[in-house]
Amino acid sequence: MNVRKIMGLNGLWLVLLLSLNTVVSCQSATKQTSSVPSDSFHCVQIPKEQLDFFRQQPPIKFWQKVILLTKDSCIVVHKDSRNMMDVISAKRLDSLVDYSKLEIAAQCYRDSFGYETCELVKFVRGKREFFDFNKVGPLVDDAKKVFDEIGVNPIYAQFILLIESPNNPKARSISGAVGHYQLMPFVAKKYGLVVSGARDDRHDFQLSSMAAAKLMRDYCIPNAQRMAISIGLEPNLDQLWFQLLTMHVYNAGAGNVRKAVAAVGTVRNGEELILKLWKTQAGAFGNSSQNYSQLALASYINYLDWMRE
């Protein structure tokens, strides 16, 4: 059973198809404007030598752009390679949908870029409104203290806060996950939080931070360690690849990630494991699960850039 469900990520992917004879209205990525000095916030840094490998990968560049674009803009992308083929206006997409021209359009894109008919072209609206770094900054500061006290690397808190309902802490997923950490009821109760009709401690940031940190310590990290060992890797809690594997456990649950890791099999190193997980489906480990660590990395890189402005 999944530990928790990610809110709203499935909505990022609409399998829609576009045409080359479209008059394209490209809108440039708009950077977020901060009403609070960004240098007043804390950022849990990832070592540059570890980050550089992943930041060059097409999926990360793709999600970086999605996070910066407003919902009025849309990216046309090849699903498997994350090759960004076009940026069009959302109005143009709506017009194509209304006039039932999407299937013809998709084939035009495939033909133009040399893809087979069976390969998927996807369309993703910008999500800038969802990723509000100005609101996340103060939360990272508070969460870092809690995670440090419990002995868990606060990089996990930062990843989660950057991608889990950052602009709507009261969000509730269809599976019942609630709050900044999108905790399921049974997880919250396990760590002493009250979840009832009259009171829900998952809305209490300090208490939910404590529960998320303990979940990482007791469940996510140990399971990620065992999975790494099972395919011949030495788990290193300070390595980015291991932290991303742990994030997958937080998102999809150990059982689903274990199936995906087993499907990947033997790899040369942890970085290769993560890249292969991004393309692996096993059990309930599907598209949203693949995207989770990609979003974590892309949002971190954009957050870091935002703080440096």
Language model features with spans:
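Solvent-exposed loop/turn segments at secondary-structure junctions
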Residues: S165-N168, A177, V187-K190, G253-V257, ...
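Non-membrane alpha-helical structural segments and their capping/turn regions in soluble enzymes
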Residues: G137, R202, Q206-M210, L240, ...
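Functional cleft and adjacent loop/helix regions within the main domain
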Residues: M247
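Helix N-cap / loop-to-helix initiation motif
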Residues: V152-Y156, V194, G253
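Alpha-helix capping and helix-loop boundary segments enriched in small/acidic/polar residues
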Residues: A171-G179, R199-H203, L207, L237, ...
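Cell-wall glycan-active module
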Residues: M1-L162, A171, K214, D218-Q239, ...
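Substrate-binding/active-site groove segments that recognize
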Residues: I174-G197, L207-C220, E271
